Curated annotation (Swiss-Prot):
Keyword field: Eye lens protein, Repeat
N-terminal arm: annotated segments: 1-13
Protein name as it appears in the record: Beta-crystallin A1-1
Subunit structure: Homo/heterodimer, or complexes of higher-order. The structure of beta-crystallin oligomers seems to be stabilized through interactions between the N-terminal arms.
UniProt note: domains: Has a two-domain beta-structure, folded into four very similar Greek key motifs.
Sections of the chain in a coiled coil: none
GO molecular function, one term: structural constituent of eye lens
Domain Beta/gamma crystallin 'Greek key': 14-53, 54-100, 107-148, 149-197
Residue segments, region Connecting peptide: 101-106
Amino acid sequence: MAQINPLPVPLGPWKITVYDQENFQGKRMEFTSSCTNIMECGFDNIRSLKVECGAWIGYEHTSFCGQQFVLERGEYPPWDAWSATNAYHIERLMSFRPICSANHKESKLVIFEKENFIGRQWELRDDYPSLQAMGWGNNEVGSMKVQCGAWVCYQYPGYRGYQYILESDHHGGEYKHWREWGSHAQTFQIQSIRRIQQ
């Protein structure tokens, strides 16, 4: 039987329904907490889903590894509804968990020019479709401190490319190096950032 709640997660308003076929067809299962391996629940993959409450992170591989996808309230009929803006398209979603710290109204993030919180810094409290257009000097971010909420950072302007989900309740909110942004992080190139909505 699947281990559906491996992480200690406070009770919250989270609900996601997953389907093994596109357009909400086939086998379905509802979750109110994390799932480390959808195959242990009798699915070979997730092809569509509905986020009914809360915000979630979906992962390309089991055990919360690989490319990340932010999943906010709404319907995702085919796989490309959550993967279309990524640098490479992935038809796989094998694990997921709720984003406990998503707090759109109170979100606060500080980005730094270099690793280990060194160099020029900039405080963010809003969504930025292009960091450079808003005054950030280059297309790279060395490190970040999430002081409140949860954020999704994108490789390219316009919320495109690889997604890196940063949370105030993971790593103590401190991401001192780009390798801490996720198991799939390839570069410290960040050109757009937005708050995750609950």
